[in-house]
Each structure stands twice: as structure tokens, then as C-alpha cells.
Regions:
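PAS and PAS-like sensory modules
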Residues: 5-6
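Conserved C-terminal structural/oligomerization subdomain of aldehyde/semialdehyde dehydrogenase
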Residues: 9-11, 16-283
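Long, low-complexity segments enriched in small/aliphatic residues
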Residues: 1-2
Length: 283
């Protein structure tokens, strides 16, 4: 690796630095796999587009990602494959706007309930929802939410020159559900229904240490104390909230949100440039 532009300290306190650009960066190197807390750009040359996406997804982080391309199909493939919370196509990747581009990451760029700041679900995470008792009503709520929201890519901004889709995706690994005798049949049945409806991957267990495969999150429905801190050390969030009666509230917890902002103009011309399509979620 070498510096194309080397950072320089601009003040005595060390709080202001000139941006830096690194070239010759290799895949899986420190510069590739770590987050720079400073204005440093590390450039990796990929032999082809498919490899570039693979390398982009190899980091443990997934807050924002961007692409600049005039190839519509290339943009669509990137949108479908990239593992990050906020995607930007043919525009800058900073300056997320509340409601238009709700903000929040994937993987180690997220912890906790995972509802995006500035999105429809954020306030819901600050409330306590009653535990499910009426399974039939909860299932109806799940089905309605999935048909109208969960399976769709929705653009609430209504702009012509920029599309701002909000959609749900599957977690990259299963969600482990820890149960015991205190877990109700209604809770377990609703989880099974959500998994069947949305395609969410779920593993049930009575002992977390018995799970050998990798997992993305833990839903703790047992009466024992949840291992919040030990799991957090591994980058895993433990959700110990009861299964909610509101089917729409509960279903959203089993998927991960994604915001996709796409420029639909070329230098101000709405008839120019690619018009890639962003699709919703299928099982």
C-alpha cells in the first residue's frame, strides 16, 4: 500500500486533518476490513464487477454503500446483492435525510432493536407492546402487514428526480429463539407463522450453547437471564421483549430494514441516466 495523498495534521490539537487516499490496497487487508475514523479513502482494484461486490460485502460493517454506474442492470444487481443498511446509487453516500432515507446499518454497524432512525418503526421500539394472547388476530395483522408493507419496496418521497425506496430484507444468518416452559404456545405459533409468511430463517432451542451454526440475532423468550453482554462481544444483539400481540409490530422485528436512494436524472435532465428498479422482498 502507498499514499496517493497522505493525511497531514492541520492544527496543534490534532482534531483537524487533511484527507488521505491510499492505493494498492489488497482484499482482506487491515485497510479493507477496518473502519477508518477519519477522512481516508482506501482504493482496491477489482478484476471484475462480481468480485468487487464480493469484496465490498466482506467487511464486518454495513452502514452505507454506494455505486456510480450508467449500466442499469449493473446497478440493479448491486442493489440486490449489497449488504448494508443504506444504499446510494449515482449520488453521494452521506447526508441521509429523515423520512426520505431512514438511517441505520447492518452487521456490526447496528446493535439493538435495529429500527432505522427517521423511519416508521423507530418510535415503536420505544414502547412496550402487550404479549400475544389472541393468535388469530395477531396472524391477521402479520398477513396484512406483509401484503401491504413487508413484501414491498415503498417510495414515500414521491420525487421524480430521485427515488427513495424503503424495504425489508432477510437477515444474513438465522435468528435463534431461546424458549423454555414459560414460553406460551401462542408465542411459538406466531413465530412459526411469521417465518412461513416472510421466509425469515429461525432456529428454536432451549440452550443457546447447543447452536453450532452462525446466527445473526437472539430472541430470548426464556425466563432465565439473557446473555446480553456476552453475545454483544460477538456482535450479536439479544432481544428479550415478549412476542407482541400486534402482528404488524412483531413481523417487522424478524426482518432487517434497508433504504435505497437512486438518482433518476443525469446532470438535471430527468430523461437522462439509468433508471434501475428496486424490488421488494420475496420468500
Amino acid at each position: 500500500e502507498s499514499w496517493l495523498v497522505e493525511p497531514q495534521q492541520l492544527d496543534k490539537a490534532g482534531l483537524m486533518w487533511r484527507p488521505g487516499v491510499k492505493v494498492g490496497v489488497k482484499p482482506s487487508s487491515w485497510s479493507h476490513r477496518n473502519e477508518w475514523f477519519g477522512p481516508v479513502l482506501a482504493i482496491i482494484e477489482a478484476p471484475d464487477f462480481d468480485t468487487a461486490i464480493t469484496w465490498q460485502n466482506q467487511t464486518d460493517f454495513g452502514l452505507t454503500a454506494g455505486i456510480q454506474s450508467l449500466d442499469e442492470k449493473e446497478c440493479e444487481e448491486w442493489i440486490n446483492r449489497i449488504q448494508a443498511g443504506n444504499l446510494y446509487v449515482n449520488r453521494g453516500i452521506t447526508g441521509a435525510i429523515v423520512n426520505r432515507q431512514p438511517f441505520g446499518g447492518w452487521k456490526r454497524s447496528a446493535v439493538g432493536p435495529n429500527a432505522k432512525a427517521g423511519g416508521l418503526n423507530y418510535v415503536n421500539t420505544l414502547r412496550n407492546w402487550p404479549r400475544v394472547t389472541n393468535l388469530e388476530a395477531a396472524i391477521y395483522g402479520v398477513n396484512t402487514w406483509w401484503a401491504k408493507v413487508g413484501s414491498q419496496a415503498i417510495d414515500r418521497s414521491g420525487l421524480v428526480v430521485e427515488k427513495n425506496f424503503q424495504r425489508y430484507r432477510h437477515y444474513l444468518a438465522p435468528v435463534v429463539v431461546v424458549v423454555d416452559e414459560s414460553t406460551t404456545q401462542a408465542e411459538k405459533s406466531l413465530i412459526h407463522h411469521i417465518a412461513e409468511t416472510t421466509g425469515a430463517k429461525v432456529i428454536f432451542t432451549t440452550d443457546l450453547s447447543d447452536v453450532s451454526e452462525s446466527y445473526s440475532r437472539v430472541r430470548w423468550l426464556a425466563s432465565s437471564k439473557p446473555p446480553i453482554y456476552s453475545e454483544m462481544q460477538k456482535g450479536i444483539s439479544v432481544d428479550h421483549r415478549p412476542i407482541a400481540q400486534r402482528g404488524d409490530i412483531e413481523a417487522a422485528r424478524w426482518l432487517i430494514e434497508q433504504s435505497v436512494a437512486i438518482t433518476y436524472h443525469r446532470y438535471g435532465n430527468p430523461n437522462g441516466g439509468p433508471k434501475p428498479i428496486c424490488t421488494g422482498l420475496s420468500k
